[in-house]
Amino acid sequence: MNSSISSRLSALRFFLKDHGLNGWIVPMADPHLSEYVDEHYAFRKWLSGFTGSAGSLLVTQDAAALVTDSRYWVQAEQQLEGSGIELVKLNQGYAAESADWFAAHLMANDCVGINSELISSKDAKNYARVFAEKHLHLSLVRQTPEETIWEERPERTEKPIFDHTVSPRNREQKLTALREVLKKEGAD
C-alpha cells in the first residue's frame, strides 16, 4: 500500500474515532459546488491520489472506496493501484452507491459524516433518505478533517471576478432579474 496515502487515511480514521463517526464521505467539491475546484478544496485528491474531477472517497475504520463514473474508471484503476482503495463503479447515483457501500462495511445505526459546506441541502436530504433506508445516519459536520489533518494544505487562490461574456444578458440585467425574484419571494 502507498505509505503516504495509508498515513493520510489513518489520520482521517483517528479524526473519525475522536468525533464518534464510523465513516466519512469526501466529495470533490467546494462551498460553491463547482465542477472544478481550487487545490485548497482538493481533499479527496490529497487523501487518495485520484485526480479526476468527479467522484467521492468513502472511508471507514477498515476500508476505503472511490465512487466515480465511467469517464474515470481507467484513470481511477491506475491511480488507486496499490493504495488499498477499492474502485466502486457508479451505476445508480452517488447517494445510492455510497449507502450500499457503507451498508456493506458498517453496522446498523452507524453514523457517516460529510463536510456540511460541500453538499447542497437537496443532496444532503437525498443522502439522509437513502442512508436511513440502509439503517445508517448522515451527519453534516462543521469541524472537518481537512482543517486538522491536511498538512501543508494549499492556500485559497485569489482570482479576479470577470464578466461572463457569452451570456445574452449583462451583469446589470442578471442582477435586476435576481432582485425581482427576491422581492417577489419576500426575501431580503
What are these regions (language model features)?
Residues 1-188:
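Terminal domain-start leader segments
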